[in-house]
Amino acid sequence: MNHIVANKIQQILGYTFTHQELLKQALTHRSASSKHNERLEFLGDSILSFVIANALYQHFPYIDEGDMSRMRATLVRGNTLAEIAYEFDLGEYLQLGQGELKSGGFRRESILANTVEALIGSIYLDSNIKTVEELILKWYEKRLEKISPGDTQKDPKTRLQEYLQSKHLSLPSYFIVEVYGEAHNQLFTIHCEVSTLSTSFIGKGTSRRKAEQDAARKALIKLGVE
């Protein structure tokens, strides 16, 4: 990784590494090198779970353990981490083996989610728990502001359907527009049409379901529900 690329990704992350080799390792998939990011991912997963659990405990003093567990699961699950990775354009910085590169690993949700966890682990090792906690809370600031006990744990398709039903409006329609890639590594493009809105919403994902959820999420934002 050259100096310019390293500086760019650190600017995006909001953190400058003292030990640059930790950044490189966090971005290295096992297909590219024996010095890959899986151990960092293991560490980052535990740190993320703790930081989010503590944030929920502090922000919601009157809710029970069950609600906190569901909210934490929503915030640390793979697709949420992948969303953060997309926001950071992490796919551009991944070190992948030729096989993974050709099969589109740079956009695979699981690889992106694991990389976010690995970065958390690497930042902790490069600094301390206080620094990485502050950074995670910055990354999650808007998500922590929006989340609340109850129906926010439902997926976007369900929330969109329930919202439209509550307004006595027609249910949304989903159409496959494109399927790209080989059978084991496909990227789906879906259009979601809502009768009350003049535009359709494009969703993408590694499965039809994920693409539909992505499109529904965009419709909810347009409707002002999220």
Curated annotation (Swiss-Prot):
It catalyses: Endonucleolytic cleavage to 5'-phosphomonoester. Pfam families: dsrm (PF00035), Ribonucleas_3_3 (PF14622). GO terms for cellular component: cytoplasm. Its cofactor is Mg(2+). Residues 6-128 form the RNase III domain. Residues 155-225 form the DRBM domain. Mg(2+) binds at residues 41, 114, 117. Its main location: cytoplasm. It is an enzyme of class 3 (hydrolase). GO terms for molecular function: double-stranded RNA binding; metal ion binding; ribonuclease III activity; rRNA binding. GO terms for biological process: mRNA processing; regulation of gene expression; rRNA processing; tRNA processing. It is found in: Cytoplasm. Transmembrane segments: none annotated. It comes from the Bacteria. Keywords: Cytoplasm, Endonuclease, Hydrolase, Magnesium, Metal-binding, mRNA processing, Nuclease, RNA-binding, rRNA processing, rRNA-binding, tRNA processing. The active site is at residues 45, 117. NCBIfam families: RNaseIII. Belongs to the ribonuclease III family. Digests double-stranded RNA. Involved in the processing of primary rRNA transcript to yield the immediate precursors to the large and small rRNAs (23S and 16S). Processes some mRNAs, and tRNAs when they are encoded in the rRNA operon. Processes pre-crRNA and tracrRNA of type II CRISPR loci if present in the organism. PANTHER family: RIBONUCLEASE 3, RIBONUCLEASE III. Homodimer. This is Ribonuclease 3. The gene is rnc.
